[in-house]
């Protein structure tokens, strides 16, 4: 069993996948939004044997939902209908900022950061979810 994390944006979708033990999230790629995006996601779902999707849910800092949240809810419904997998909406506040900070600390160039930021945001979203389920299940051995 693996879980896929998605950072759904206006122009791109960042993709991350968990390891088989559900401990860590790895960035896979950034998909350009297009009519073929679902085909590309389907291929990755099959290749990585994914059985659950975690979709970043864009809340405002005060917890309210903005216009992007509605688009994300609609995309979640499309994913459920298209792939027949459970889709969890996961609070993505600060995921992009965290990804940017990590890339800056790693001294990644501006051009390279732009290429990988959505994939890294998907990693932050998925890792947050993985940490949550591990803690919820009492498997946090820190």
From Swiss-Prot:
<dbReference type="InterPro" id="IPR005227">
    <property type="entry name" value="YqgF"/>
</dbReference>
<dbReference type="Pfam" id="PF03652">
    <property type="entry name" value="RuvX"/>
</dbReference>
<dbReference type="InterPro" id="IPR012337">
    <property type="entry name" value="RNaseH-like_sf"/>
</dbReference>
<comment type="function">
    <text>Could be a nuclease involved in processing of the 5'-end of pre-16S rRNA.</text>
</comment>
<keyword id="KW-0378">Hydrolase</keyword>
<keyword id="KW-0690">Ribosome biogenesis</keyword>
<keyword id="KW-0540">Nuclease</keyword>
<dbReference type="InterPro" id="IPR006641">
    <property type="entry name" value="YqgF/RNaseH-like_dom"/>
</dbReference>
<dbReference type="GO" id="GO:0005829">
    <property type="term" value="C:cytosol"/>
</dbReference>
<comment type="similarity">
    <text>Belongs to the YqgF nuclease family.</text>
</comment>
<dbReference type="GO" id="GO:0004518">
    <property type="term" value="F:nuclease activity"/>
</dbReference>
<protein>
    <recommendedName>
        <fullName>Putative pre-16S rRNA nuclease</fullName>
        <ecNumber>3.1.-.-</ecNumber>
    </recommendedName>
</protein>
<dbReference type="InterPro" id="IPR037027">
    <property type="entry name" value="YqgF/RNaseH-like_dom_sf"/>
</dbReference>
<dbReference type="GO" id="GO:0000967">
    <property type="term" value="P:rRNA 5'-end processing"/>
</dbReference>
<keyword id="KW-0963">Cytoplasm</keyword>
């Amino acid at each position: 069993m693996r879980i896929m994390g998605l950072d759904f944006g206006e122009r791109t979708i960042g993709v991350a996948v968990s390891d088989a033990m559900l401990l860590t999230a790895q960035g896979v790629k950034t998909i350009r939004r297009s009519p073929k995006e679902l085909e590309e996601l389907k291929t990755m779902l099959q290749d990585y044997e994914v059985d659950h999707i975690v979709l970043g849910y864009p809340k405002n800092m005060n917890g309210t939902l903005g216009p992007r949240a509605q688009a994300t809810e609609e995309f979640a419904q499309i994913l459920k209908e298209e792939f027949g997998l459970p889709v969890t909406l996961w609070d993505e506040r600060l995921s992009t900022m965290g990804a940017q900070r990590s890339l800056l600390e790693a001294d990644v160039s501006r051009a390279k950061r732009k290429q990988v930021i959505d994939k890294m945001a998907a990693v932050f979203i998925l890792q947050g979810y993985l940490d949550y389920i591990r803690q919820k299940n009492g498997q946090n051995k820190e």
